[in-house]
């Protein structure tokens, strides 16, 4: 019987340090805390030490990403030394009997690709494919589970609709075009991985959110229906049916896109209440009395159960690729983990095939706009000395791994 995957997740830019060739905004001073992502956690140099933290948690898997801009600093020039670094990481994980879950793209892009328009460029799926074709042969012998793209909807919305992330665009039309190109980039990547190793298991890490009507009004309910479909369903629909529906595309069908995921990777954090607004797509409203995380969104781990039940219709296995909480005082995190794992247990009892859980994150790290102010880690990091210390919630998670027999 296949073992349930217990693990944590990180991303290259947030933990490695030394990423000087990508597009992230600290170079323009747009990080709220004015923090720099260097040296971050120095995971690039300390990964062996950090893998011991994974063993401390009794985990048998680890999700991490490679940094495109390290490997291909200039278009078409691939740094073999950097590729070998990630091979070393994979080899070390295998030695420790830790299943690697490898993410090929986690938000950042090389500067040369940014100058070409990034994922707005019609040629971006081909450009990304060229990168993937180069690196996958090095990793294929070590990796069974692949994530092609992390949170494509988040990347498109925050970077191209709201303008909070690079490149700072504020255009619904452009964000939809980016989503379409990310769908096609996934399609090309899926083919490359499967060509290299047929038995590989491939997906995206899909951020999913619960939307509720702020009022018991017809228009609020219509907004909820629209947002749930746009945010949660349409991307997955494209990867299962092969049809890129409006507004992401023009209802066009790609045979290579159909059934181009082997499981569904789910990133779940919270729910939001929304109301109709005549001048906006929606308006978010906070309910009185709800508990908030340090990030400002609602503490609602129970929502994972509803998300998992909603996904049952796809008839795919499910991996929780991220689930976590910013909690500097570590007062809520242990309970959050317990309730999240209980949600998985209840969903499995309803016939949902969940085969793993990755807590976000292994350790405190560089949060995209908030710098080092948001503490997601099971391990606290002193960013002056880079010392790692387990929080109480690390012991909670470790004990949960021991006590649950999925």
Which residues does each PLM region occupy?
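Active-site region of glycoside hydrolase catalytic domains
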Residues: 1-31, 35, 75, 84-406
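Aromatic- and Gly/Pro-rich amphipathic surface segment
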Residues: 24-52, 57
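Short glycine-rich, polar/acidic loop-and-turn segments at beta strand-coil junctions
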Residues: 10-12, 53, 66-70, 106
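Catalytic domains of carbohydrate-active enzymes, especially glycoside hydrolases
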Residues: 46-67, 259-264
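Aromatic-lined carbohydrate-binding/catalytic grooves of carbohydrate-active enzymes
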Residues: 57-83, 102, 112
């Amino acid at each position: 019987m296949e073992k349930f995957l217990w693990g944590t997740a990180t991303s290259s830019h947030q933990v490695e340090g030394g990423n000087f060739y990508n597009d992230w905004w600290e170079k323009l001073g747009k990080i709220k805390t004015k923090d720099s992502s260097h040296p971050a956690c120095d995971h690039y140099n300390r990964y062996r030490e950090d893998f011991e933290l994974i063993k401390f948690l009794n985990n048998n898997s680890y999700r991490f990403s490679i940094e495109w801009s390290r490997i291909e600093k200039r278009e078409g020039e691939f740094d073999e030394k950097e590729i070998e670094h990630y091979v070393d990481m994979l080899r070390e994980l295998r030695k420790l009997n830790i299943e690697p879950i490898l993410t090929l793209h986690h938000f950042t892009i090389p500067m040369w690709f940014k100058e070409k328009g990034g994922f707005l460029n019609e040629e971006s799926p081909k450009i990304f494919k060229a990168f993937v074709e180069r690196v996958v042969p090095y990793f294929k012998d070590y990796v069974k589970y692949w994530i092609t793209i992390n949170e494509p909807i988040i990347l498109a919305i925050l970077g191209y609709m709201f303008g909070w992330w690079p490149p700072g665009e504020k255009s619904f039309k452009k964000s939809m075009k980016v989503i379409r190109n990310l769908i096609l980039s996934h399609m090309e990547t899926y083919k490359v991985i499967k060509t290299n190793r047929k038995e590989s298991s491939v997906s995206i890490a899909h951020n999913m959110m619960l939307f509720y009507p702020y009022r018991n009004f017809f228009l609020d309910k219509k907004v909820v229906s629209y947002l749930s479909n746009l945010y949660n369903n349409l991307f997955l629909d494209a990867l299962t049916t092969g049809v890129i529906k409006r507004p992401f595309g023009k209802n066009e069908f790609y045979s290579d896109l159909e059934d181009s995921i082997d499981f569904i990777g789910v990133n779940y954090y919270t729910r939001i209440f929304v109301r109709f607004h005549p001048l906006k797509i929606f308006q978010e409203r906070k309910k009185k009395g709800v508990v908030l995380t340090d990030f400002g969104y609602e503490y609602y781990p129970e929502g994972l159960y509803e998300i998992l039940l909603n996904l049952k219709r796809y008839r795919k296995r499910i991996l929780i690729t991220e689930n976590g909480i910013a909690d500097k005082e570590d007062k809520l995190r242990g309970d959050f983990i317990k309730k999240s794992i209980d949600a998985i247990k209840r969903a499995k009892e309803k016939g949902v095939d969940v085969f793993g859980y990755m807590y976000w994150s292994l350790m405190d790290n560089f949060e995209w706009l908030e710098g080092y102010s948001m503490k997601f880690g099971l391990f606290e990091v002193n960013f002056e000395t880079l010392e790692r210390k387990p929080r109480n919630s690390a012991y909670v998670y470790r004990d949960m791994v021991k006590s649950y027999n999925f």
